Amino acid sequence: MKRIRDDVYASGSQFRRPLGSSRGQLCGQSPVHGSGDTEEEEEGGSRRVSQKLTTNDALSYLREVKEMFQDQREKYDRFLEVMKDFKAQRTDTGGVIARVKELFKGHNNLIYGFNTFLPKGYEITLIEEDDALPKKTVEFEQAINFVNKIKMRFKHDEHVYKSFLEILNMYRKENKEIKEVYNEVSILFQGHLDLLEQFTRFLPASLPSHSAAQHSRSQAQQYSDRGSDPPLLHQMQVEKERRRERAVALRGDYSVERYDLNDDKTMVKIQREQRKRLDKENRARRGRDLDDREAGQDNLHHFPEKRKSSRRAEALEAYSGSASHSEKDNLKSMYKQAFVFCEKVKDRLCSQDDYQTFLKCLNIFSNGIIQRKDLQNLVSDLLGKFPDLMDEFNQFFERCESITDGFQRLAGVMSKKLFSSEEQLSRPMKVEEKESEHKPELEAVKETEQCKKEYMGKSIQELDLSDCECCTPSYRLLPADYPIPIASQRSELGAEVLNDHWVSVTSGSEDYSFKHMRRNQYEESLFRCEDDRFELDMLLESVSSAARSAESLLNIITEKKISFSGSFRIEDHFTALNLRCIERLYGDHGLDVIDILNKNPATALPVILTRLKQKQGEWKKCRDDFDKVWANVYAKNHYKSLDHRSFYFKQQDSKNLSAKSLLAEIKELKEKSQNDDDVLLSISAGYRQPINPNLEYEYLNRAIHEDMFKVVQFSCEELCSTKEQLSKVLRLWENFLEAVLGVPPRAKGTDLVEDVVINPKTLDVNHSTSPNGEAAVSSGGDTARLASRKLKSAANGDENSSSGTFKHGIGLLNKDSTGKENLEDVEIANRDGVACSAVKPQKEQETGNEAEKRFGKPIPMDISERAAISSISIPSGAENNHCVVGKEVLPGAHEIQAKPSDTLTDIHHDVDSIETVHSTQGGDVGNSIVLANGLRSDSSKGTRNSDDPEGPSRNEKEEGELSPNGDFEDNFGVYKDHGVKSTSKPENSAEAEVEADAEVENEDDADDVDSENASEASGTESGGDVCSQDEDREEENGEHDEIDGKAESEGEAEGMDPHLLEGESELLPQSERVLLSVRPLSKHVAAVLCDERTKDLQVFYGNDDFYVLFRLHQILYERILYAKRNCSGGELKSKNLKDTNAGDPYARFMRVLYGLLDGSAENTKFEDECRAIIGNQSYVLFTLDKLIYRLVKQLQAIVADEMDNKLLQLYEYEKSRKPGRVIDSVYYENVRVLVHEENIYRLECSSLPSRLSIQLMDNIIEKPEAYAVSMDPTFASYMQTELLSVSSGKKEEGHDIVLQRNLTGLYDLCKAMEGVEVVNGLECKMSCSSYKIAYVLDTEDYFHRKKKKKKTEQLWQRNKVRVERFHRFLSA
């Protein structure tokens, strides 16, 4: 028959079928067969031609679509996306049809053309679609009503109703013909003609039976009267045929990218894949047939009778099924059981929603959406609280698995029938409402199943609940999609009060439940004792209970109160624990004994009772014995078990004591305290670093130092391999470590007599002038007299030598105190009561000041202050009237008394800081002079060497000056302060006169004008100020013979006699012996402020080794102090201390510590003793042996390290300066020269109170200095001859006597400079090639005069008067 849409297509289509295809093919009636041949078949008078489609057909269709939407490119692109999604299996055929239909809406020719490529059974209809949907609604409702009518009619005979559903289901599964259906239903409805007649309305008209034919004729008459189509049987058969012979849909990407295909091989491959895929989808598609039919429910109820009848038959087919003939009998019985089970589930489930959910689960399983395991999980959620129903469901499931797709078919029948009947009887719904309801439910089920798969096999401990809701710190809410296990025996009360959703996640197993508080070994011992006691108690209680039960039963048997007939059971008299006890009592034969007891209790019971009492007695005796053992364990371990900190402390302390950890600690503190403003300020002030200690410690108990020394000494004797190493380590401890910390030295018996030294800080020296002109020295103590006697006794009789000769030089000054570059240095000598003054040449002063480089802030200093800090010198003799350094006297001023330093109790510090003077034994050796740094200097001319008569002396070096190259170094001069005072008194004036003459004779070359660089400082500061014409002449005649470039020894560089170095160096103590090999290192230093508080400070600059040493020392000090403080109350805390008369607890602790160090005591014994003496807080002392070992090893490393020894020598060198003259910046710069880029630590110790502060200094990289080794020789010669040269003229023979009244100008100048701040920070740089001088950026000079407060007040008063006058003028 020719369909209406064919006419529409023929009249209105602009799309031409490629290769001459008919309209029928374009309408979707040309399936692609597997053989690929062309088929022709008659169907309702119409001729359909099925021809194989090619790629060209698809490309032609694409061109047509592209031309149609050439102005709407997005639609064409969307069509290509649909094809790509279908190829990638992201959508199925139904989805493609829906999207194409919507996309080509209004373009029927394209839709009909697209039908050409669809398989059989799939086509897009446009006209009939509007009529088909409302008809299905009426037919479906009538079918539902008919099925319910049958159910009500045969409610007492469920077999008929279930058999009817089984027949329909088999028909729906295409396993039963329509004739068989009618015959079986006729037999089933025998005696109920109304039901049979109503049933025939749903069947096709052409049936062989008479009743069916008669009914068909009446129906045909009705169809012909209404002019509708033939009966629907033919259409139903055609649809069934289409379902059986579904063609393969054309799959592929129909985009223009496929133009390169020139054959149909790809099409054949796609068709094969589609067949395989459709085979898997058949089962799911059959289940969707019902949903497709339900989609047509609308409010239209009127349609032709012929079509209505066919639609009713189709609705009945929705409930019909099919099964193979061999499985027919099994399915029948299973259907009956299934429906009975469903009714039982409905009755047990109180909620109708739960029952509907159960049916939905069966439905989605029958459609192949979920698997068997998923279904069982879903059903267990619903029926878990009914174990009997769950067991019956699982058994029924297993029986159905024996039949091919048995349960799936059964589930489909059960779900569709019951679900549809319950749903439709309760509330008929529209298709839109159904789809909107079922689709979210199916999606929710799928998501739930997916989440269950994720959570499957995972315990709650493995879940990540960090993002879940938190109720308390311990409890968190489980995820909403986490499957909650069903409690099978939960009561209603339990369901109300018990929790299923809030869980407390454990963090580990039982043994490690508290990772931050693990049980120590003593607790483990206690736990084992408790376990043993509990187990033995349980055994005793078990055997006692079994014995009582056996004895009671035996008494009953003896009294014959029980009969051993068939009703006797041994379990009625023995509990399970009793029987288990008897079984364990006999071991492998326990089951046999129980069997004998059951068979013959009268005979077996006495034997068993005897055995039970025997074991009971043995175990009681065993418990009594073990009680003593357990009591001993408790006594030993209870107190120790309370110590939870020692285990972790011992683990962590080994890391904390390592050098890496200590270094990291101070670096971290420095980074935290780092202030950007301080850094900028330090840079702007000439790279002066702020003094901000990173660590500070106090040493308030000095008695601890003695205990520490003894402990370290004891350990060193055990660890040091040689006596020499032991001596070096102990000397480092005493002479350096304790000296820095201000620890008083310990007595050494007669050794102190050999090395008597004088500490300037302990002397109160008053300088005065006697009437006869002799310098009088007043000593404040016996120490000075003892030293004076010793110095006199060291004299060798040489008239040029003097006992007690002192000569002190001053250190490098920070700035020109007066702020005047050409300030003349004045020396005031006092010999024979006559004061004289020597003024250095103006050119010499200018040259010295020009070469000096200054950094930092100047320190204003008047003459009195300079005199107070001046060096001490004793003239060694005089051969003429040359001026000798003496006491400085100012006009109108009283005599100046040297300010005594604070007297320290630290005698050992005095030993380290005093300059010991030894007289030489040979008459040919010159006088020994104590330098500013504590060294002796020979003043005889024989020790002076020079390359030329006009050059500077090689052996005259300035403190704080780096000397990498002698030639270059000698070209620089430094500013010198020449205030010198006498510190010893000659016995008579003649002796003083001789000494003065010798001094002048030996050192008058220092001011020789023939020297080109007369400003070069000698080893002693005052040496250059003593004028001697005879020495000048001798230098002119004798120093030309010296070899140019001769290397000088370090001792000679300091102006010392090499004979003294060789002969008497061994007589010096170790603290002074290191001074013989040191020299200044750095040329340029930054300014520092001299403060009164610095007089009590000991400053040491060291590297990482010294920092670690002081930190280990401090830790050891704290722990021993901790032990001493806690020893008083420790014994009261210990309950197991037996020796109550042990004496001093601290002394006992020290004895135990010595035993640990020498190996006589083990660590366990030491820990026990510490707990007994101090208590549980003694855990910090358990690692003392390791701490002391590290400390001794660090001492050994410092003694053996070359760089560390250099730092120690440099410290002694700096410490040898006169108190108050130590310049911190000089020291720091010298250390920087040594350690280069390593860390530098500033260790500062104050004496009152004893406090140690440690600071990690910044590594500031300053601008590089030009050393002589890298300077151009031509430029060096130019600088020496032109820039740094002085007048070569000789001095006149005589010198004018300078009276004190001539110093008035200088005094006025100094007074005028009071309150003035001068910073000479301007720097210049010179080009070595062009000799051009340029200023250095960011450098400047600074001059500021502080205004007096009085002047400010006067100015304010004047301004106030002027303001008042102005106001009066305005008011007038």
From Swiss-Prot:
Task: Write out the biased-composition intervals (Low complexity).
Answer: 210-222
Keyword Electron transport tagged: no
Q: Which residues carry this modification: Phosphoserine?
A: 1049
Q: Where in the cell is it found?
A: Nucleus
Q: Which UniProt keywords apply?
A: Nucleus, Phosphoprotein, Repeat, Repressor, Transcription, Transcription regulation
GO terms under cellular component: nucleus
Question: Which parts of this chain are annotated as the region Disordered?
Answer: 1-50, 210-244, 272-323, 764-783, 791-817, 934-1056
Q: Which residues form the signal peptide?
A: none
- Kindly give the InterPro entries that the UniProt entry links to this protein: HDAC_interact_dom, PAH, PAH_sf, Sin3-like, Sin3_C
The molecule here is called Paired amphipathic helix protein Sin3-like 1
